[in-house]
Amino acid sequence: MNPPVSTAAPSVTATTATPEWFDMELVDAQTDETFTMNDFAGKVVLVETMAIWCPNCIFQGSEVRKLHEALGNPDDLISVSLDVDYNEDQASLKEYASEWGFDWHFAVAPLLVARALGNLYSAEYLNPPLSPMLIIDRDGNVHQLEYGKKDAETLQEAVEPFLTK
């Protein structure tokens, strides 16, 4: 049984030191382009850890898509989905994103990135069915959202304060 969708504004826990994983290279599965989190400095970044086998991740991806549509696809909101299942590869991730119509950045998290997420924030970031997400604000501060599925409205409530700053 899937956990209920969170309808309350998610609580946010912030960290201010720039994490090392922001400098680690990722490869966008859809474009084959290399990027780092630091490439998005000055923008608001919504990061989700996921896996292609995870049904909650499909739901969460659909809600991220609705979020972008509701906000008019702003240039200063970037979404990144990091596949933390080391058994999955770039080709299968590309197929997954295409199949579901997800058009933001998808990357297989290298082991060092996955370890950093688990060590810095919590091992739950390596458990995709918990729908772990975080927001990186314009100043590079990391804000962790509560675990559990979040609908587009809840995500909008979480990101809008950072978009208006």
Predicted regions and their residues:
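Non-globular targeting/processing and membrane-anchoring segments
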Residues: M1-N2, S6-T7, L163-K165
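N-terminal "domain-start" segment that seeds a small globular fold
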Residues: P4-M37
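Short active-site neighborhood of thiol/selenol oxidoreductases, capturing the structured segment around
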Residues: F35-I58
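Alpha/beta-hydrolase fold active-site loops
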Residues: V44-V45, L77, S131
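Rossmann-like NAD(H)/NADP(H) cofactor-binding core
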Residues: V47, I78-L82, A107
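Structural microenvironment flanking redox-active thiols in thiol-disulfide oxidoreductases
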Residues: I58-G101, L112-N119
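Thiol/disulfide oxidoreductase modules built on the thioredoxin-like
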Residues: W100-F102, L111-E160
